[in-house]
Amino acid sequence: MNKLKKKKAGIKDFFKGKHGRNFLLALDVLLAIAFFAQPDLYYNPQAPDFFDRFYADSLIICGGLWAVLVFLTVKKIHFSAEVNRILTYIAGIATPFIAFLWLEFYNDAQFWVPIFSIPFLYLVLDIIVYYVIYVLFLLIFNSIRAASICMVVVTAVFGIFNYELTLFRSMSFIASDIYSFVTAVSVANTYQVQIDVDTAEFFMMALVLVALLLKLDKVKLFKWKGRIVYAIVSCMIFAGFTQVYVYSDYLEDIGVDFRVYRPQYKYRYYGTLLTTMRTFGYLHVTQPEEYSVNAVKKITKQYTENESTETQEKNTSTQNKTTKKPNVIAIMNESFADLK
């Protein structure tokens, strides 16, 4: 444990020192080179006028975010303990909401309709998902700064992954895709990653948010006794959350539904993470009313007995055999389909 602490302290001291800042500054330069190496992000050669060929919004937004990133890289910012604590708690309260707005505006730019067209109840339920995820990160890291950074990174990864997945198969992420991970990996090498202006801005915003959060000093949230209490409370929150969002019919009762094969058409009505959570409910398959395994066995018993008798008769004689078999009527219901 002491070796691990020393290693972490060494890494922290490196990035706080001159060599660490130079290393991060070199990464910023490489990021700018990577941007200009993709002309589609800022240049349209088919425009008739020279100045119209450049995407002003892309150059201004990405350029501005890059300038902020460079400033945060080279500038030493130190807050007093009291100010740092206040800013840390503000970050803890605001990060899930910022992640919600950030992801929804990105999806609005790519596929959906404006966030303000989503009904208020669905917006509230969507925001709750972000805060519950944030509670999980707080439980894991016991640090607001670390939980906020993880929230930003996970939001960025999910947003870009969902966008690329939709481009690849014309279908957004649903919960059953988890069981197709191996298949997805096997065909991933056939897909060409596509980066557009909105994705570049989304990625740059993630870097800026992480850089801002790293300017805060780490504040331990709970001591070990408080952490135990928080773990118990968190488990209660997760239990209630999964019961409402996954195992109950509440979301269905208030009209939250989705199309299995075109879920992105429902994302625009309910928000991204609320729709994603709704798809997890379809992994929980419940038995139809009056369904009984014993009743099925009782009905099929006479036919299985006849089948064994028929097999014996075939060995002795091909005559005088009974071939009584049932008529099977199958009623398919897609809602009872096991997506696993």
Where in this protein do the model-derived segments appear?
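Aromatic-enriched hydrophobic runs in primary sequence
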Residues: 1, 69, 130, 147-156, ...
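Transmembrane and membrane-interface helices of multi-pass
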Residues: 8-266
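Short, intrinsically disordered terminal tails adjacent to the first/last structured region
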Residues: 1-7
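Soluble catalytic regions of membrane-associated enzymes that act on cell-envelope
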Residues: 245-340
